[in-house]
């Protein structure tokens, strides 16, 4: 009977150690989370446009060109950090940059863009997060690169850094 009382705590302790060890060894980098959309057509978008009077339709916005789709919000600190790179992509004119404003206040977004500069050719408002769900977004910022045939070729979860910027440029060229 005493042996049973000693074995159960030992097994419990061993399980806790195994769980902790597992949590330490798994890679927790969100940019390495898999996307089911890679090498597939982009999900269609119908939303209110932040910049234009007409409805945002991906069928109009996504033509026969390379497109960078960036999910962002004004309350997102990493979005502010990556904004420099988004502007760089826009200024280079190699690709069209589309923004998806995720669960944000449109008036704040307009002010934010006036202050930091607007790199987006158009911005869809994702008020309730439905577009992000359709795209499999884990969190923001998150960026997708779509080729001229409408196929998602690259996805990055997290802010764009020098390394990611260079990686996207290699794919484009």
Question: Where is each model-derived feature located?
Answer:
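Short, Lys/Arg-enriched, disordered terminal segments
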Residues: 1-7, 28-31, 91-92, 96, ...
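N-terminal targeting signals for export/organelle localization
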Residues: 1-48
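Short pre-active-site segment immediately N-terminal to redox-active cysteine/selenocysteine motifs
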Residues: 41, 65-67, 71-75, 139
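A short beta-strand-turn-helix
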Residues: 45-67
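Conserved hydrophobic packing residues within short motifs/helices of P-loop NTPase cores
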Residues: 69, 98-100, 144
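Conserved redox-active cysteine motifs that mediate thiol-disulfide chemistry
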Residues: 71-88
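Conserved segment of the thioredoxin-like fold in thiol-based oxidoreductases
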Residues: 91-92, 96-128, 140
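Thiol/disulfide oxidoreductase modules built on the thioredoxin-like
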Residues: 114-119, 126-172
């Amino acid at each position: 009977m005493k042996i049973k009382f000693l074995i159960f705590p030992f097994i419990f302790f061993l399980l806790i150690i195994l769980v902790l060890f597992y949590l330490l060894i798994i890679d927790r980098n969100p940019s390495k989370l898999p996307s089911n959309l890679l090498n597939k057509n982009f999900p269609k978008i119908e939303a209110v446009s932040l910049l234009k009077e007409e409805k945002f339709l991906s069928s109009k916005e996504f033509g026969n060109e390379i497109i960078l789709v960036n999910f962002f919000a004004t309350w997102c600190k990493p979005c502010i950090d990556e904004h420099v790179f988004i502007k760089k992509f826009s200024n280079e004119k190699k690709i069209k940059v589309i923004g998806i404003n995720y669960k944000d206040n449109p008036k704040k977004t307009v002010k934010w863009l006036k202050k930091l500069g607007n790199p987006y050719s158009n911005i869809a408002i994702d008020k309730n997060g439905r577009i992000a769900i359709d795209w499999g977004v884990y969190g923001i910022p998150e960026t997708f690169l779509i080729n001229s045939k409408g196929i998602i070729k690259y996805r990055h979860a997290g802010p764009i850094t020098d390394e990611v910027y260079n990686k996207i440029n290699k794919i484009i060229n």
